């Protein structure tokens, strides 16, 4: 048991490095362990026992903060994908869409978030809790940002006034996830820009700029 009395059910002592609050250190270690295990073997590899072993904590410590391994896995993914969705001020709707789609491609191809997303998306098909967390924590906030871009473009006259926001969001981002999961074609910045260009060709207003 650790010095603070929160050792796990396996009686294991928990690792600690100086200079960080114990709770923050443990949470980060758990989330990183969950992410590493999912990259290596999917959600089935990220059991509470395996996460605890890799993080150097007891299972009771994990259950104190998360109800299931799916919840740990999702937060571990969010940790890896932090600060991946921002826009500069004053850009057009067209440029904002390009920035967002290129950012998604970079995240999935240049960081561990790509393998993690593949694992989470696969396991979410048979795990309702994980699927809900994926929608609520990852997809919904990002769709909200992009939807605001589209609404602004429609209001300014850059994009069509009768724009179907939800369908357009699917047209813009679904190709990225399709290539990430199935790997049938290159997932790179050139593809991201081509995708946005094709969508923009159909949603710009007659007076809208490039």
Where are these regions (language model features)?
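Helix-loop "lid/cap" segments that line or gate small-molecule binding pockets
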Residues: 102-109, 117-126, 196-202
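Amphipathic alpha-helical packing segments from all-alpha helical-bundle domains
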Residues: 109, 115, 129-155
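Short amphipathic alpha-helical segment with a characteristic S/N-K-E followed by hydrophobic residues
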Residues: 30, 45, 68-73, 83-84, ...
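C-terminal peripheral helix-coil segments that are non-catalytic and often amphipathic
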Residues: 1-15, 99, 140, 144, ...
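Tryptophan-centric aromatic hotspots in well-structured domains and transmembrane helices
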Residues: 65-66, 134, 138, 177-178
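Hydrophobic alpha-helical connector segments
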Residues: 75, 85-117, 168
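Short hydrophobic/aromatic patch on the recognition helix
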Residues: 56-66
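Basic, helix-initiating cap at the start of DNA-binding domains
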Residues: 1-56, 71
């Amino acid at each position: 048991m650790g010095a603070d009395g929160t050792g796990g059910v396996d009686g294991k002592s928990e690792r600690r490095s100086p200079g960080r609050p114990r709770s923050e250190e443990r949470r980060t270690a758990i989330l990183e362990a969950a992410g590493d295990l999912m990259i290596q073997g999917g959600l089935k590899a990220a059991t509470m026992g395996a996460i605890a072993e890799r993080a150097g904590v007891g299972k009771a410590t994990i259950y104190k903060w998360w109800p299931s391994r799916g919840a740990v896995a999702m937060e571990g993914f969010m940790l890896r994908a932090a600060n991946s969705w921002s826009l500069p001020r004053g850009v057009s709707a067209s440029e904002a869409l390009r920035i967002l789609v290129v950012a998604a491609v970079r995240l999935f191809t240049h960081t561990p978030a790509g393998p993690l997303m593949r694992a989470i998306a696969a396991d979410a098909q048979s795990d309702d809790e994980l699927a809900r967390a994926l929608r609520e924590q990852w997809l919904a906030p990002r769709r909200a940002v992009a939807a605001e871009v589209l609404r602004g473009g429609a209001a300014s006259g850059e994009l069509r006034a009768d724009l179907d926001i939800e369908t357009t969001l699917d047209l813009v981002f679904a190709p990225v996830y399709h290539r990430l999961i199935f790997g049938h074609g290159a997932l790179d910045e050139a593809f991201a820009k081509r995708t946005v260009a094709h969508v923009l060709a159909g949603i710009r207003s007659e007076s809208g700029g490039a």
